[in-house]
Amino acid sequence: MHNTLLFELGTEELPARFIPGLIKQLEENSANLLTEYRIEYENIKVMATPRRLTLLVNGLADKQQSSTTMKRGPAKEIAFDENGEPTKAAIGFARGQNIDPKDLEIREDNGKEYVYAVAEIVGENCQDVLPKLLDELITKFNLPVKMFWNNKQDKFLRPVRWLVCLFNDQVLPLNFGTVEASNISRGHRFLSQGDVIINSAENYEEVMRDSWVMVDHNVREETIKAQIEELADQMNASPEMPHDLLEEVNFLVEWPTALLGNFAEEFLEIPKEALITSMQEHQKYFALVDKEDSSKLLPYFVAVRNGDDHGIDKVKAGNERVLRARLSDARFFFEEDTKTSLESKREQLKSIIYKEQLGSVDQKVTRMEELGKTLLDILELSEPVRSLTLRAIALSKADLPTNMVSEFPHLQGIMGEKYARIHGEDEKVCLGISEHYLPRHTGDKLPQTMVGTITSIVDKVDNIASSFAIGERPSGSQDPYALRRQALGIVHIILETELAFSLEQLFHRALSLIPESALVAPISNILDDILDFVKLRSRTIFNEQGLPIDIIDSTLEVDKANVYKAYLRAKVLKDYRDSQELEDVRTAYTRVKNLANKAKGEDVYTELLQDETEKMLYHKYLNTEDKLLSDLEQDEISSAISELAGFKDYIDQFFDEVMVMVDDKHLQNNRLNLIYHIKEMYRQLADFSIIQD
């Protein structure tokens, strides 16, 4: 198994943002097809540049693996007559399988005998099979967009200009539209001499490197990182190197060469976030910050060119000239924005539509203010947090109409903080404005102030409630308003801040603030859907924290709205999983649950309690429930478990000595209702029937 397959699809420049997805498809589809075609191999390597997608398969077998197929036919008694001769059914089946009836085999299946057509498929030479496999591989690309060329006969993400297909040193017959496969590739668009002959699949990467192409994107990325870090070290700096930018730059070049540029220090008067964003989004540059103080932006940048260092000084000067124009624009935006306060910009929110059915962003902020008051009341937060929070909410969206945010939307909140500080707002208000968008993505930091925490929660609650209210909810992989991420953010914030409150009350308030004409269903129905939606996010996060799914479900089943309480209870229940106490609780709960389902859930009438055992059970229930509720109120979960475990003996004695299903319906219903209330007492903590052994 020393064969090597090379498949290179050469194109015009591919959009950088789509290349990672194409790499993943090529890896997965090629592996699946090789398995489907029964071709053994050692490893697959997929590589990509802006102008090519490459598949390299090493250690290919000479031949496909042979296989045996079995096709079941009619039952034996139908296939053969009493003399053992094949019937028309057997003959017809054999003909359909292209075998002689005498070659049919009899095998047993689920205790019954059938005839089978058994055939061995001999493996073909891989060299003969691979063209068909690769032709199928080409058709499997799921393209985000398509271009057509050659009178619309051919289509791909970008026009295909060459095709290399080698099995060792032999060209395999293959075509993509009108492009025929050969052993001729192309080197770097500007540095190479054009056509590159690949004499052997094994030497592909080496030959391409000699033609100024680093085909392996992983090697290319490491090269870019090393070059950037080396230049940054020269300035005693650290590069701002977000993965998305590094990945995009990587797929813009075939031969990277990094260069160090600078800009006038006067631009450092602009908030660094605006400068960095301008460099990254417009120019694909890497900003540099002080190695000792990452909050200090330095007047330097690193750019990566697609070429060598020839004429690098001219390239540097050109990059600096372009950046100077960009930063001048940013300075103009900043100066214009700071001429008026954030408060004065609130009026402009009336002309920005939030959602057509729900009016303007100003109306959204008004709803947020009402939600903020509700949450502040629930949490019993007083001054100065109350007034500072409501101020932060009022100004939270006021930076949306600014020039800077209009140019760079992802700076929303960040610029609001800067502008609020310039115009003398309280520091907690400034931070609350920027923090209310947190977390912006998975793994992002959370709000660090209570003002930011409350503002963030009410913003996300309004976003989720308003979207569900008008029927814009996530479905499948579609989540255009990032509602799943926002629900996850709410749960993360609640767990981080240990805020124990019911989301049901807050979401109900949010829905009540939406015009009735915009609602697609009754509020109660929408509320249930929202709480179930948040419950799934809670379930995910609890599990990521190491809690077992069954224990998570047991607590969320009885209270999906109080996220922190459910988490605390699940955390303690996990520690009790193998304890005798939890086993006693589960056993007792199972006994009462089965009968409780027959109860009407009415009050227990003490005058109908006749047996001393049931009287004792009832009084113990009242006593235990009082202690249980007190324990749960103070988050004394261990004590609550002990209370319920100690209740088991009373339940056992009751079932041993008292007949529940007596003929007297009044007595029967009263006893069933007692059992029902005991079950509900247990459910104050969890649904113990969900917890597995």
UniProtKB/Swiss-Prot annotation:
GO molecular function, one term: ATP binding
Location(s), subcellular: Cytoplasm
InterPro entries linked to this entry: DALR_anticod-bd, Gly-tRNA-synth_bsu, Gly-tRNA-synth_heterodimer
Catalyzed reaction equations: tRNA(Gly) + glycine + ATP = glycyl-tRNA(Gly) + AMP + diphosphate
Keyword Kinase found: no
PANTHER family: GLYCINE--TRNA LIGASE, CHLOROPLASTIC_MITOCHONDRIAL 2, GLYCYL-TRNA SYNTHETASE
Name of this protein: Glycine--tRNA ligase beta subunit
Organism: Natranaerobius thermophilus (strain ATCC BAA-1301 / DSM 18059 / JW/NM-WN-LF)
Gene giving rise to this polypeptide: glyS
